Amino acid sequence: MNIGVIDCEFISGKGGKFPNLALMKISNYHKKKGDYVQLVGFDELNPISLFNNTQDRYYISKVFSKTQIPGYIKRGDNVFIGGSGFFYDHEHGLSDEIEHVKPDYSLYKGHESNEYFNKFSIGFTTRGCFRKCPFCINRNCDRVVRHSPVHEFLDTSRPFIMLLDDNITGFSGFYDIFDELNATGKPFIFKQGMDFRLLSLKKMRKIWDSNYYSGKTKSKGGRTFFYAFDDINDYDTINEKLNTYYSNIPYKHNLIFYVLAGFDRDNKYTDEFFEKDIRDTLKRIKLLFSYGAFAYVMLHENYKLSPYYDLLNDLKNVCNAPIHVAGKLFGDAILQSKYMKLYDWIESHEPQYLKLRQNIKSVTVN
């Protein structure tokens, strides 16, 4: 059987900076059955080739709903679609016999765009979360469960491990999984970040002492740990944990928090919400800067409705590219001064954006 797999993000060039794990598992599953599998691009797929059955079967996966694809490719009888870009709530996951097959890391051979495609083993040790964040793909989950042992997706020829777990710090077997990862001798990283609110000092020390990925340098000082600060209601908890973290940290490293903005949990998106949203966003960023932590601003698609659209874009540009501040380039002094120049920039820019715009009821940005 001839199998064509389509990675919508990868071949569209929009967001395809990471291999599609589900497609790699599907590929290996079929190869084990003796089938021929190839990565297919949109330019090779058209209504004629699709309906003339150039391939016996197509698997199409899309991670992001915003990724545009030709409408006709979903209409073939031999077409199977999946991924969070099509089904946001995991309604159509892989069968167990495919889910627990080792990924086919050769699927993207010759098409690699970065080190994720050829240097990392990729997989989940746990799945799920109990936070029920309304913007999250796991909003209908109520627990964190063990998914697979590390050896299930480990390619011993690859130097690093990338974990896609949703909330590893919320799993009861947290320490056992870190021991399992450390035992491989390979540096590893949790791409989705970790839940900072759940970090006890014991868990912090387990993370610090682990064989965590540090990029091109082998120094612990080159490590970057990712967390999230999405809700202003977590302010006191994050502040308390940051104080514990920086009071006990054994070596210097980078701490980055994803900061969500522009999302209304009540789904009303009124002027009052956007006023509060920008203030809450600034307050969260200021707290992180005060400790020397990094803020990485994540803008929900509805931020475009905000009267403070321009400030949110400014904040994103400043925080996510820290050497670029208000159109001027700065050197390492920004990082060495623990982001205080960025803190001052926000302080000086806040008043000019936070004037109530009484005549603005809604804003549409093209």
Identify what each model region corresponds to:
Residues 5-8, 57-63, 137-242, 252-261, ...:
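Core AdoMet radical
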Residues 79-110:
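Ser/Thr/Gly-rich flexible loops in soluble cytosolic domains mediating phosphotransfer, phosphorylation
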Residues 31, 182, 286-290:
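Anion (oxyanion) recognition and catalysis
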Residues 26, 68-75, 177, 203-207, ...:
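A general structural detector for well-ordered alpha-helical segments in enzyme core domains, enriched
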Residues 30, 129, 133, 163, ...:
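Conserved, mostly hydrophobic/aromatic
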Residues 214-224, 233-366:
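A structural motif corresponding to the C-terminal lobe/cap of the Radical SAM core domain
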Residues 1-81, 85-89:
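A short, structured N-terminal alpha-helical element that caps or precedes a catalytic domain
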